[in-house]
Amino acid sequence: MSRVIRAPRGTTLHCKNWQIEAPYRTLMNNLDPEVAEDPANLIVYGGAGKAARNWEAFDKIIESLENLEEDETLLIQSGKPVGIFKTHTMAPRVLISNAMLVPAWANWENFWDLEAKGLTMYGQMTAGSWIYIGTQGIIEGTFETFAALAKKHFDGTLKGKFVLTAGLGGMSGAQPLAVTMLDGACLVVEVDRNRIQRRLDTKYLDVMTDNLDEALEMVLKAKEEGKPLSVGLVGNAADVHPELVRRGIIPDVVTDQTSAHDPLNGYVPNGMTLEEAFALRKSNPEEYIKRAKKAMAEHVSAMLEMQKRGAIAFDYGNNIRRMAYDEGVKEAFNIQGYVPEYIRDLFSEGKGPFRWIALSGDPEDIYKTDEKVLELFPEDKLLERWIRLAREKIKFQGLPARICWLGYGQRAEFGLAINEMVRKGELKAPIVIGRDHHDTGSVASPYRETEAMKDGSDAIADWPILNALLNTASGATWVSVHHGGGVGIGYSIHAGVVVCADGTKESDLRIERVLTSDPGSGVMRHADAGYEIAIRTAKEKGIKMPMLK
């Protein structure tokens, strides 16, 4: 019988203080059955993104945190605790490095070989950095992306528009809800019936069907009537998308969030059942990868044909274009990436995904912080709309949590306000504040966050390392550096940061420094690349950049 892990609730400490209790609880929360995609195998989301290397390592991490002193730092090497060193009370309590490889060795084949030897672990982004909050963790970013698309192409709404996509995993499962929040009609293709059911259970999806004709009838009727609706179709996009092209049914928007970044443990080939695919994955991995890449080529070819016939097509950061390109689809990069198309301006002003978790386990703590963020930033109408929709439509998974996009200055102001609420006893327990690695200054990913940079610096990976070093120096509660998140091994380097608001004056210092430095490094990165919004933000906010003219 598999183990069931859930984070403790309430105010009883299992560690020496809340700065240690915070990672203790959020690591467990990552493996909560409500949160993780495959908790029995320590897989949190994103194909094979894990929280710990194996169960022995997990147990040792928990034991280490329970015994960690207030002035010690625990080191995690790809999901395994390898050392505890005396540092100081304002240093991070945990430092994490996941899946890092010397560049010439940085490909899936070498990674899988080293993983099989028990030497490394794929941490995705927030899986191995212990700050995943379920599908809500990506929902506002997805909402922001589709809102920006709607603003650019459709007068600010998806009403009366048909959006086609694929994938209903831990991250991709946010797509249907984001589309219906913007009043659109969405068809999502997913090979795994259980994943579709999970999105139904959490109310991210409206309807499930096995029948393409039925799915199209529902979606096209909703489009015609201008009603929001999301339909999950059990099927393979490499079969469904070409069939839509053959029928001449072209969506208004087409994208994709399957786990194409991982051709072995993520994307599922067409022409076989899910059970047959899983069996082939184990018996003949090389053949599986070959078939998966062939299916990706068919999938992307159909998206390109839809684009030629008038659909707005964009890549949603899973590296499917590169996989298809390597299989001979030379026009794959005619599909534009979502960051340069819709998100870059937000990143340039230091805006990105800001999340917080109620360690008490009480939803009321989140509702009170919802009110606080609205009180602090009444001029931000998109934020107001988002919080209202989130409270209405999003079901908490594991420990109650919230995400919203906040910019430079806003993050520190809100973080300090949360710490004050904890100090005054307005909240039942401390709050953990973190973010996705998919943020303004914390990623080098040429096929996603840093695609088509103005100065050609797409592949420069100094920036996420500087971000991690700066957050460590600023006194974050824990800091992580990962390789391969989102787009796969060899294609990205990225960093994460978390700070615990425990109500102390020391936390005021941590929060102000971290939540200023972290987004500030993103403004710096984009200003250095020549983005006018970032240059203006740096000057207006007084961010010191010695070479900024």
From Swiss-Prot:
<dbReference type="InterPro" id="IPR036190">
    <property type="entry name" value="Urocanase_sf"/>
</dbReference>
<feature type="binding site">
    <location>
        <begin position="267"/>
        <end position="268"/>
    </location>
    <ligand>
        <name>NAD(+)</name>
    </ligand>
</feature>
<dbReference type="Pfam" id="PF01175">
    <property type="entry name" value="Urocanase"/>
</dbReference>
<dbReference type="GO" id="GO:0005737">
    <property type="term" value="C:cytoplasm"/>
</dbReference>
<feature type="binding site">
    <location>
        <position position="316"/>
    </location>
    <ligand>
        <name>NAD(+)</name>
    </ligand>
</feature>
<feature type="binding site">
    <location>
        <begin position="46"/>
        <end position="47"/>
    </location>
    <ligand>
        <name>NAD(+)</name>
    </ligand>
</feature>
<dbReference type="Pfam" id="PF17392">
    <property type="entry name" value="Urocanase_C"/>
</dbReference>
<dbReference type="InterPro" id="IPR035401">
    <property type="entry name" value="Urocanase_C"/>
</dbReference>
<keyword id="KW-0456">Lyase</keyword>
<feature type="binding site">
    <location>
        <position position="195"/>
    </location>
    <ligand>
        <name>NAD(+)</name>
    </ligand>
</feature>
<dbReference type="GO" id="GO:0016153">
    <property type="term" value="F:urocanate hydratase activity"/>
</dbReference>
<feature type="binding site">
    <location>
        <begin position="236"/>
        <end position="237"/>
    </location>
    <ligand>
        <name>NAD(+)</name>
    </ligand>
</feature>
<feature type="binding site">
    <location>
        <position position="190"/>
    </location>
    <ligand>
        <name>NAD(+)</name>
    </ligand>
</feature>
<keyword id="KW-0369">Histidine metabolism</keyword>
<feature type="binding site">
    <location>
        <position position="124"/>
    </location>
    <ligand>
        <name>NAD(+)</name>
    </ligand>
</feature>
<dbReference type="InterPro" id="IPR055351">
    <property type="entry name" value="Urocanase"/>
</dbReference>
<comment type="pathway">
    <text>Amino-acid degradation; L-histidine degradation into L-glutamate; N-formimidoyl-L-glutamate from L-histidine: step 2/3.</text>
</comment>
<comment type="similarity">
    <text>Belongs to the urocanase family.</text>
</comment>
<keyword id="KW-0963">Cytoplasm</keyword>
<dbReference type="InterPro" id="IPR023637">
    <property type="entry name" value="Urocanase-like"/>
</dbReference>
<dbReference type="InterPro" id="IPR035085">
    <property type="entry name" value="Urocanase_Rossmann-like"/>
</dbReference>
<feature type="binding site">
    <location>
        <position position="486"/>
    </location>
    <ligand>
        <name>NAD(+)</name>
    </ligand>
</feature>
<dbReference type="GO" id="GO:0019557">
    <property type="term" value="P:L-histidine catabolic process to glutamate and formate"/>
</dbReference>
<dbReference type="InterPro" id="IPR038364">
    <property type="entry name" value="Urocanase_central_sf"/>
</dbReference>
<protein>
    <recommendedName>
        <fullName>Urocanate hydratase</fullName>
        <ecNumber>4.2.1.49</ecNumber>
    </recommendedName>
</protein>
<feature type="active site">
    <location>
        <position position="404"/>
    </location>
</feature>
<keyword id="KW-0520">NAD</keyword>
<dbReference type="Pfam" id="PF17391">
    <property type="entry name" value="Urocanase_N"/>
</dbReference>
<dbReference type="InterPro" id="IPR035400">
    <property type="entry name" value="Urocanase_N"/>
</dbReference>
<dbReference type="GO" id="GO:0019556">
    <property type="term" value="P:L-histidine catabolic process to glutamate and formamide"/>
</dbReference>
<comment type="function">
    <text>Catalyzes the conversion of urocanate to 4-imidazolone-5-propionate.</text>
</comment>
<dbReference type="InterPro" id="IPR023636">
    <property type="entry name" value="Urocanase_CS"/>
</dbReference>
<feature type="binding site">
    <location>
        <begin position="257"/>
        <end position="261"/>
    </location>
    <ligand>
        <name>NAD(+)</name>
    </ligand>
</feature>
